[in-house]
Amino acid sequence: MSDVTFQFDPKQQFQLDAIDATVSLFSGQPRSGQAGGNLSIEVGGGTGEGLYQHALGLGNQLTISRNQVLKNLQAAQDKQGLMPDSSLIPALPDDTDAPAPMNFTISMETGTGKTYVYLRTMRQMHAEFGWSKFFIVVPSVAIREGVKQSLRDTDKHLRELYNGEPMDFFVYDGKKPTELAAFARNSCLSVCIINIQAFIKDADVDHTMEEAKRSGNVIYKP
């Protein structure tokens, strides 16, 4: 039986609009690429003292201010006829300069190609801003497998749109911390697919510093 090949239309305007709306949130961000940081991951068998791998990790770097992101968000909402938000979520004091999370919701109708849009959005962010680390958080194993297949199915098509740039991906496994270490060090466009349970596992547990080091969950650290 012959293999099935999917044909993707790269010019669906509603999909391009969704990608542009997301990328425009960071308008003004230079192509600064990645910032370095220290990485410590347990690679032993989880018994005794354990073995820790120390390395330099690379992460996406956002240099524009939260206020600029808010202005970009309001412009994107106004363009779509939505009521502009007055603050980012979560809201922080005006004098806060420290890095902080920002949550955005992008809504699309069922059957409009949401997976295609967010996979292509990651590539567009890489092309414009140099960002190369992305997480896809899924609620179930079935959806995780579907995402993996979508990454395979769209690979050739998206490479053709983005100068042959490959996109590496893997499924997070707490028993294989070296894979996460490689992801953190890698400067290539990379995606980690992770079940939401990997975050929930430790989120409700109070850790001492030593317990945090030894936690089997290296994604979430208090």
Task: Indicate where each model-derived feature is located.
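RecA-like P-loop NTPase motor core of helicase/translocase proteins
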Residues: 1-222
